[in-house]
Amino acid sequence: DVLGSRGLGDVYKRQIFQPEKVRKNIEFIEQIKKLEPDVICVVAYGKILPSEILEIPKLGCINVHASLLPKYRGAAPIQWAVLNGDKTTGVTTMYMDVGMDTGDMILKQEVEIGENETTGELWDRLSIIGADLLVKTLKQIEKGTAPRIKQSDDFTMAPMLNKEISK
């Protein structure tokens, strides 16, 4: 089952992988295949998984993304929300596909951004919300009740910040 025979407590005993390279990484792909996972969860990883990995788990690969998709697809959604003076942001769980944060959404939770809140403070809050949303998402996937909500074509990107942007 998705959450393990002992429920949520068993989730924390799962292996965590953070390979620097996933594309054409045959050893890593074989390692994942041997695990025969029901679900692969991706959080704050920053790399697009190739179809060879996305096709492995029986119930799909899911991602926890720190924005209300389709707004702020990409590597720096929290930073862009703060830089743009947004009043709200949130967390979205979604099924992964080969695109950058383009998969079907599962759950969302919106939060207000404090007037003087820093990206670090917001990151901390969204991390807690994201963990809770991940658990809710996994429970729905296990029950077979997780929705698949298509994303609108009206999206914005949140590219990694660089020196040019800061000028």
Residue spans for each PLM region:
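One-carbon transfer enzymes
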Residues: S5-K167
